[in-house]
Amino acid sequence: LESIPFQRILSQRKNKFENAIVVSAGPSLTKQLPLLKAYQDKAVIFCADGALSMLEKEGIVPDYVTNLDFTDLAMKFFQNKENKTSLNVLSCATHLSLVHFLDNKSVVLRDDPLYQRFNLNDFGYIDTGTHVSHFSYTLALALGFKNIIMIGQDLAFDEEGNSHSKGFDFGEKFSGEENIDKLKVPAYAGKGEVLTHITWNDYRIKLEYLFACNDQKAKF
């Protein structure tokens, strides 16, 4: 209850801008950073917590930083950060140590009957999904953005076997991704195949469904 009520954020910020960029920490982010830096003043930036360090090193200040990790591993993404202007939007599933650590935050209740029973309507409700890119996208939708660009959302390993972008706090080959069953799927635009794992593939399917369900609200 110490966080900024989500409904207040909506009342103050909804439909103020049309263009949003959702930034994730996939391997392709590295090559997209120069363009993002050049256009950072042309759009509102939603940053997955894992990509925060990469943006900070380029002098890019995101408007929103999202997190929904139920473990405290994400503490590393926020430690020793100079940025105090971004609004940290956290899921109700976010680990309590991170909730207490961060200032300028809004803890948002998931769009679920279980949470609606608490009658804390000022702090809800949003479809947070199962990963931060989903959360960032639905947050941008809730704020009324009409054009939402997704970058760094590979959901696949690159040709060198990297799971994350250069500069990721846990390394480009994050060990947490190595022991999950792998499979090959068609690459973006159907150009060949890429290696992914079952969790990422599930994220991809859910994201594609999310985009399709909201194609009248926002262009992807």
Where are these predicted regions, by residue range?
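Metal-ion/cofactor- or nucleotide/acyl-coenzyme-handling active-site neighborhoods
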Residues: L1-F46, S53-F220
